[in-house]
A protein has these predicted regions:
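Periplasmic/extracellular, small/polar-rich flexible segments of pilin-like filament-forming proteins
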Residues: 55-153
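Sequence-pattern detector for short linear motifs
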Residues: 10, 41-44
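N-terminal alpha-helical signal peptides/signal-anchor transmembrane segments
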Residues: 30-36, 43-64
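N-terminal single-pass transmembrane signal-anchor helix
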Residues: 1-34
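Extracytoplasmic/periplasmic, Sec-exported soluble proteins
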Residues: 38-41, 106
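Short, functional N-terminal and low-complexity linear motifs
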Residues: 13-21, 39-40, 78-83
């Protein structure tokens, strides 16, 4: 009887299965890294927006003159967020010495993640003695969720 060399079908299936597992693991890690990058970018963007608003309107008694297009143009930043939605600015109607940064167009998962993030220097974060995130949101299914963070005095 002759002995043949080569790979058997079982060996090839085993190798392909291992490759599939490695590929799936790599995809999961890449996806997690991309989500972390987006979340970090939102944090950086909000910090830049808040700094810009305070720099542009800080000399006034309140933020009633806030205007989305003027602010985003002045700080040379797009109002688009990495999740496909927008950043929006508005004066807090109950306290004109405060303004609200809203992040819209979010999925439920992203909304929940941003809602629990510590928004340092936000009114809610400071008032709670750093025990609450400072963000408010009602996160539901779909991609129309909004996270709002209040800044100011």
């Amino acid at each position: 009887m002759r002995q043949e060399s080569g790979r058997s079908m079982i060996e090839m299936i085993g190798v392909l299965a291992i490759m599939a597992i490695i590929t799936a693991g790599a995809y999961a890690l890449i996806s997690m890294a991309m989500n972390t990058e987006k979340r970090n970018r939102v944090g950086d963007d909000v910090t830049a927006i808040v700094s810009g608003v305070k720099q542009l309107l800080g000399e006034y008694d309140d933020f009633s003159g806030i205007n989305n297009s003027t602010i985003f143009g002045a700080i040379s930043m797009s109002n688009k967020n990495p999740y496909g939605g927008n950043y929006e600015l508005a004066v807090d109607t109950t306290n004109p010495r405060q303004f609200i940064v809203s992040i819209n167009g979010l999925s439920k998962t992203v909304c929940e993640g941003l809602k629990t993030k510590a928004w340092i220097d936000s009114v809610g974060y400071n008032v709670s003695n750093h025990k609450e995130s400072g963000a408010t949101a009602n996160c539901v299914e779909g991609n129309n969720n909004v996270v709002s963070i209040t800044y100011g005095d």
